[in-house]
Each structure stands twice: as C-alpha cells, then as structure tokens.
Amino acid sequence: MDLHNIREDYSKQELSQANCHADPIQQFEQWLEEAITAKANEPTAMNVATVLDGKPTSRIVLLKEVNPNGFVFFTNYQSRKGQAIEQNPYVALTFFWAELERSVRIEGRIEKISAEQSDNYFASRPYTSRVGAWASNQSQVLSSKSELVAKAALIAAKHPLHVPRPPHWGGYIVLPERIEFWQGRPSRLHDRICYRLVEGAWHKERLSP
C-alpha cells in the first residue's frame, strides 16, 4: 500500500509564545474549549501511554476533569494500564484535534484520586455503565461475548437500583511536568510551544518543528 501522497498542508492558525498563557493548564483549557466550540470529534479523547516491563503501550481514554493540579480520567485499576501504572507511575497523554490542526502532549506522574472523588463520579454514570464496570474484568481473556452479557445480567439483577463502585475501579490524576502545544503550519514549519516544570515554576519555550 503506497501512502506517500497522503498529506495535508496546515494553515488555519498560528501559535506565538507571547500569546500563550503563563500557566499551561489555562492554555490547555482554552484550547479544549475551542475544540468543543468547533465541534471537534471526541474533543476529550486522549491517548494514554504507559510502560509495563519496559514495553510501551497506549490506548484511547476520555478526559473527565482538568483542574489546576492536573488531568483526571477513570478506569479499572486491574486493567493492563492499571498494572503498568502500578509498576511505573509516569505516563504520557496526547490530544489531537484535527479540525483545528492542533495537538497537545502531556508528560507527568500519575496517582489515584481519593475514594470519595471516585465514588462521586461513579454515581453520576449511567446505570448500564456502572453495571459494566462490575461485569468486565478489563484486559482479561473472554471465552465469548455471551459470557460478558450474562455476567452483566447477573449484576443488574443483584443491583436493580443502586450499583456501588467496584473497589478495583476509580480515578487517576496526571500531575504534569511537561506540556507541549503543537499548531500545524504551512511547509511543515509548525509552531511548538513547550512548558517545563522546574522547581515548582513553569518555563515556556519554543521548540523547532
């Protein structure tokens, strides 16, 4: 399959160091809001990269909160990503908003949020999603799809109204140490503005594309 001629030339916007916020979290919130306004497809979807036994792996997860401390998502703690995080508590996140020709890369340490925070979010989820969190042994081999459906039915019968949060399911927060904003530009002369956390303060610099 020859893919040599598949390419795009980016020209929608530019990114200057002077116009970026001093705080990268604020800059991210601005870009995320613009992605939502532009009706970007799945604007909160992000690639979460982890390392397990020295081997990288990645998957798409939905961002559920951004606050001054970092970026929050929820998952099964016993999943492959959960095992990787337990072994190596450093991850990388990547957002890509094709409609705006933009990308954001985030690197940092990850830790669990409080049980209370996880309880509150879990209670806000649709009933079927709460049932699914119990039914799925995430990342484990299934003999068939019917096995999963049957298990979900048993959980629903056991908890027809209130579904408690599984102890193996909850939230993580990524505490950023490096955040890079990428804006596509013509002739591959892209804009890259990088923030690095140095002794508690953010340092902003332009990188070569």
Curated annotation (Swiss-Prot):
It catalyses: pyridoxamine 5'-phosphate + O2 + H2O = pyridoxal 5'-phosphate + H2O2 + NH4(+); pyridoxine 5'-phosphate + O2 = pyridoxal 5'-phosphate + H2O2. The gene is pdxH. This is Pyridoxine/pyridoxamine 5'-phosphate oxidase. It comes from Actinobacillus pleuropneumoniae serotype 5b (strain L20). It comes from the Bacteria. The keyword Oxidoreductase applies. Belongs to the pyridoxamine 5'-phosphate oxidase family. Its EC number is 1.4.3.5. SUPFAM superfamilies: FMN-binding split barrel (SSF50475). Its cofactor is FMN. FMN binds at R59, I60, V61, L62, L63, K64, F74, T75, R80, K81, Q138, S139, W182, R192. Homodimer. GO terms for biological process: pyridoxine biosynthetic process. It holds the Pfam family PNPOx_N. Binds 1 FMN per subunit. Catalyzes the oxidation of either pyridoxine 5'-phosphate (PNP) or pyridoxamine 5'-phosphate (PMP) into pyridoxal 5'-phosphate (PLP). Pathway: Cofactor metabolism; pyridoxal 5'-phosphate salvage; pyridoxal 5'-phosphate from pyridoxamine 5'-phosphate: step 1/1; Cofactor metabolism; pyridoxal 5'-phosphate salvage; pyridoxal 5'-phosphate from pyridoxine 5'-phosphate: step 1/1. Substrate binds at R7, E8, D9, Y10, K64, Y121, R125, S129, R188, L189, H190. GO terms for molecular function: FMN binding; pyridoxamine phosphate oxidase activity. Keywords: Flavoprotein, FMN, Oxidoreductase, Pyridoxine biosynthesis. Transmembrane segments: none annotated.
